A protein has these predicted regions:
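Alpha-helical support elements that line or immediately flank enzyme active sites
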Residues: 101-123
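Internal maturation/activation junctions in enzymes
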Residues: 1-40, 52-53, 60, 167
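Cofactor-centric catalytic regions
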Residues: 2-11, 18-19, 147-201
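Short glycine-rich loop/turn motifs
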Residues: 19-24, 33, 82-87, 174-175
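Acidic, glycine-rich active-site loops and adjacent beta-strand->loop/helix elements
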Residues: 40, 60-63, 103-105, 133-135, ...
């Protein structure tokens, strides 16, 4: 309320610092759930806007390789490699909940780590998302968040991994999750590494 005054102001458009991906998950009391991720890629995507909608088309076709015979070579009916991965967790064919971890190459790594904390370690959605993460980059290099337990880092070093530390918390992915309990209660978790929120009504 402090920022709203009684004086007229000329509207000023926002100036986002960086482009990025958006992840959204939602669930209702009837059991409907959605896992949604959107990313135009390469800033403004393809630069093509669907007439009359204002919706910019994505540019994930940039992920194709033009080298003949390459596994990701462009061809009719093929989809390019990309990192848009909206996740959805089921158990014995029943929906448990939507989740996603944004962050390019970190997405599949983040999915595995969050689900491991949730399923194998028994953490709730928020604790699973809060837990420290690692990121494999290439070769034997593994970057760790500073909070990672020292004995696990030492174990990786003994196996020959090169350990790096990244204080840019956003480099380790940005996750959101909703989990339905067996009793039908919905629990949510949101990323402390970036802007995010859980809301219920």
């Amino acid at each position: 309320r402090r920022l709203i005054t009684e004086k007229a102001l000329e509207p000023v458009p926002g100036n986002p610092k960086d482009p990025g991906t958006v992840y959204l998950c939602a669930a209702d009391n009837e059991g409907n759930m959605i896992s949604y991720i959107q990313s135009n890629y390469a800033g403004f995507g393809s630069g093509i806007v669907i007439p009359g909608t204002g919706i910019a088309m994505q540019n994930r076709g940039k992920g194709f390789c033009l080298e003949p015979g390459h596994a990701n070579a462009a061809a009719p009916g093929k989809r390019p490699y990309h990192t848009i991965i909206p996740g959805f967790l089921t158990k014995q064919g029943k929906p448990m909940g939507p989740f996603g971890v944004m962050g390019g190459f970190m997405q599949p790594q983040g999915h595995v780590q969050v689900l491991t904390k949730l399923i194998d370690c028994g953490l709730n959605p928020q604790a699973a998302i809060d837990a420290p993460r690692w990121q494999w980059t290439q070769g034997l290099q593994v970057n760790m968040e500073p909070e990672f337990p020292a004995h696990l880092i030492e174990g990786l070093q003994q196996r020959g991994h090169k350990i790096g530390y990244d204080i840019n918390r956003g480099a380790f992915g940005k996750g959101q999750m909703i989990l339905a309990t067996p009793h039908g209660t919905l629990m949510g978790g949101t990323e402390p590494r970036c802007e995010g929120a859980c809301a219920a009504w």
